[in-house]
Amino acid sequence: MIVVFLHGWGVRNPDYGALPEWLRERMGASVVDVWLSDYITYSDSVTMGDLVDAFERARQQNFPGVKFACVTHSTGGPLARQWLATYGVAAAEGLLTHLVMLAPPNHGSALAQLGKGRLSRMSLWFDHREPGEQILDWLELGSFESWRLNQGSLYQPLPFLFSLIGSGIDAKLYDHLNSYTGERGSDGVVRAAAANMNYNWIELKQAGPQLNVTGKQRSAASAFGILPGLSHCGPTMGILSSISLQNASHHLAAQWVERCLGVTTLEAYAQVSGELAATLEKAPDQGSMIVVRVKDGAGRPVKDFDVYLTGGPGYDPGQLPKNFFIDRQRNQITPNALTYYVDHRVFQQTRELGLRVGARPEAGPVNYLAAEFRSQEATVAAVLRAQETVMVDITLERRLDQAIFQLRRAA
């Protein structure tokens, strides 16, 4: 088995811990052929597409036509998934047999919006080096590129897919000026809900003052686990970099990676998935992400809008449970995307969930009418789940005033 390791973003000297060496010793050098990647993410000129093309070129040069597995950390996860989506022939041939993602920002990271300059000042993560801006843009919550990849993945055949993330916060990496580094339901960089590849997509289209459900899709079930005591990175608690030859035999991440790579049948995959699912209830926090994208009937982004979550019998923002709200972030590059992050345990106190959308201008030659979506209890339970993301695609009616264009009979 060829195992390719893909590191994360903003890395100049990849640190895979002792996991590659330990796997080779554990599974046998004749069984495991380990390849370590080293790719550039700190240049502003490099895009995710560039990395995908370069990965494919390296694969063709080194082991063309040979099946392989991937173990990724952080941004390496979306990179491997983008490779799958881009090089469909390879995906159809089943060349990628296993994808084991550690702390993957599949739905983005709230930290990305801070900008490369501020992130570079977090010396323990980036050693005072600025991460590449275009990769950073990809990672921002609700980005066009991540949305496209996740929507496409709803219909894409996948290999044996595993997502693992820690629930620990390393105090040494906490930034007192930025609460995201200690955010509930995260590993200090990525939210569990953003790492999870079990998610929902729902489409709402406006009809007068109402938003009606016109489409919905759930992702194929995939293995997801939350590992206590592990954070995104760091030599002490990092989900990957804290693995040593001395602790690998009892290190949670090392143990699970070995088990995931050993899966060869659907029955074994279901067994591992079930055991990982049991870790979710033990997680100290349970957050949910709601990523909203607003556009008009022609597909053009609506950039000036407000989205309110509503609850209670009256579908009012004031009737939502207290302390349900954790964070709200609008994408700076794709301003028609907005992400809510809520405490799912608190949110479960309401049986009703709604969305109220108001876009501007509200009057004038071209305007928008405010619209509202009201769900039922069963819909809330099915769509908004703990430690998951729901993608909400909203299409508003673009209203044209009669005065914008008129015809009159000539005298």
Please provide the spans of the model-predicted regions.
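Short beta->alpha junction loops
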Residues: L36-T47
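Short amphipathic beta-strand segments in non-cytosolic proteins
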Residues: D306-Q329
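Serine-dependent carboxylesterase/thioesterase catalytic core
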Residues: V3-W9, M48-Q151, D296-K303, V307, ...
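Short Pro-Gly-centered beta-turn/loop motif in secreted/extracellular proteins
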Residues: Q329-N367
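A short, amphipathic beta-strand motif
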Residues: S288-D296
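Short, surface-exposed "cap/lid" segments of acyl-processing enzymes
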Residues: M1-D33
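Extracellular beta-sheet/turn segments enriched in Thr/Pro/Gly and aliphatic residues
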Residues: L266-A283, R356-A411
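Helical cap/lid subdomain of alpha/beta-hydrolase-fold lipid enzymes
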Residues: D53, A85, V89-T279
